[in-house]
Each structure stands twice: as C-alpha cells, then as structure tokens.
Amino acid sequence: MPELPEVETALRGISPYLKNFTIEKVVVRQPKLRWAVSEELITLKNVKIVDLTRRAKYLIIHTEKGYIIGHLGMSGSVRIVPQDSAIDKHDHIDIVVNNGKLLRYNDPRRFGAWLWTENLDDFHLFLKLGPEPLSDEFNAEYLFKKSRQKSTALKTFLMDNAVVVGVGNIYTNESLFICGIHPLKLAKNLTRNQCFSLVNTIKDVLRKAIIQGGTTLKDFLQPDGRPGYFAQELLVYGNKDKPCPKCGGKIESLIIGQRNSFFCPKCQKRG
C-alpha cells in the first residue's frame, strides 16, 4: 500500500504537469472504486488547476471550482502520459489537461478513491485525522500526551491516523527498530525520552524515503514509471530470518493489528 512517502513522491512528480493548467475533461472508465467516483468529476471542463497538495495519504487537486481528492488505495498509481497513450486494462480515470498531457489513474484492486468537495475544511474524511508527521505539531510532547492511558501495542498506536497520519506499516517497523523499541510495547509506557527519539526517527525515516522516491515492494512506481529506491535501505521490514544489521541476530516477524511486523528480539526488548 502506498504510504506518505509514496504519495508525496507522486504529488511532486505530477504537480509540474498539472498546476496552472486547465482541465479539458475527466474520463471515468470505472466508477466503482472503494467509494463511487464523484459524479462532479465528469462535469469538469475548462476548469483551471491552481494548486496540488497532500493531506495524509490523499492527493488534493485544487481547482477554481473545488477540490479533487484522490487516494491510491492498496495498489493504485498515477502517472503523467501523452493524451494519445494506449489505455491499459486497469486505467480507470484520466484527467486531461490543456498541455497535451493527462493524469492517468491505474488501480488493479480498485481500493482507491476519487472524490470531490467544494469545502476542504468540512471534508468528512479529513475531520478526525491527526497531525502530519513532518509538521511541528507532531512533536515529543504531543506524542507523550497522546499515548497516556493507551493500553494498545505501540505499533498499532503509531499507525492510527487519529494519532499521526501516513506513517504506515513499513516506516513504523523501521522507526521502532532504529529506536530499539519493541512493537508490542504498550503506548502508555513510552517515556518522554522515547517519544523524543521516536518523533525524530519517524521524521528522518520519512524524509529519507521521500528523497529515494518511496519504497517499491509490489505495486508502487513513481509517476515517471521508475521504482522507489528506499526498499534498498530497509533494515527490518520484509527481512524475516535475515541477520539483524545491529547485532547479527535473526529478524523475527509477527502479526500485530492484522499487519506483518518485523523486529529484532535482542535489540528491541519488550517492556
């Protein structure tokens, strides 16, 4: 599943081809995604795109009439292609602009979404989201206060979008390993020093992943078709039974919150 670095990579890749250009039309070949594609999209003609931003794992295309909100789901991707490009089986949506290009959304599993709102502040999917992990709002004191009385596994806690958005499974695994904290540690038992270390590490891991163009494991490619190279930097994620890069012991895995978790039992003591 594309996480924050992958979505940020997509945003940076598509923005130069869309910002300040005009939507000529939106072609919807498959409206049945996770939620039905908003009907307003197919009515967009001669509408200028004024900006592109991201909130959590949502792409936001700001137009002069409202906002197109895209989510890549489990297997979705976006790319910029010439308007005469051949259409593949899972190419569900095209946003055609007046520069000879179009934004094409491909999604084999159809768990993504393309929605419309005229008021971003009241958009229902954003109302309960926590802070952005790279923002100043996400800091050690915030994490410490948020974790009090939380008798849940730390890994699950960090992947809760009401706590902090977009960190995701891969980057939570990597951050906990770097900090030497067991993924099953109860959130309420975090110390202030551990919160300080975690916040700084999460920010550092995410920034590095963005620089590398995200992590390509299966479905994700950058908008220009290249893979994300952060997979080459992964320390524990997907490395079950391989040597720990710190101590040489064996990396183990277990299921936490229905997601695969990878850790070193020697370097990440539970407690």
Curated annotation (Swiss-Prot):
The active-site annotation reads 2-3, 57, 259
Return the InterPro entries for the record. Answer: DNA_glyclase/AP_lyase_DNA-bd, DNA_glyclase_Znf_dom_DNA_BS, Formamido-pyr_DNA_Glyclase, FPG_cat, MutM-like_N-ter, Ribosomal_uS13-like_H2TH, Znf_DNA_glyclase/AP_lyase, Znf_FPG/IleRS
Q: Name one GO biological process term.
A: base-excision repair
Q: Give the protein's cofactors.
A: Zn(2+)
GO terms for MF: 8-oxo-7,8-dihydroguanine DNA N-glycosylase activity; class I DNA-(apurinic or apyrimidinic site) endonuclease activity; damaged DNA binding; DNA-(apurinic or apyrimidinic site) endonuclease activity; zinc ion binding
EC identifiers of the protein: 3.2.2.23, 4.2.99.18
Q: Which residues belong to zinc fingers classed as FPG-type?
A: 235-269
Q: Cite the cofactor comment.
A: Binds 1 zinc ion per subunit.
Residues that hold DNA according to the record: 90, 109, 150
Matching entries from NCBIfam families are given as: fpg (TIGR00577), PRK01103.1 (NF002211)
- Subunit organization: Monomer.
Protein name as annotated: Formamidopyrimidine-DNA glycosylase
Q: Which organism is it from?
A: Haemophilus influenzae (strain ATCC 51907 / DSM 11121 / KW20 / Rd)
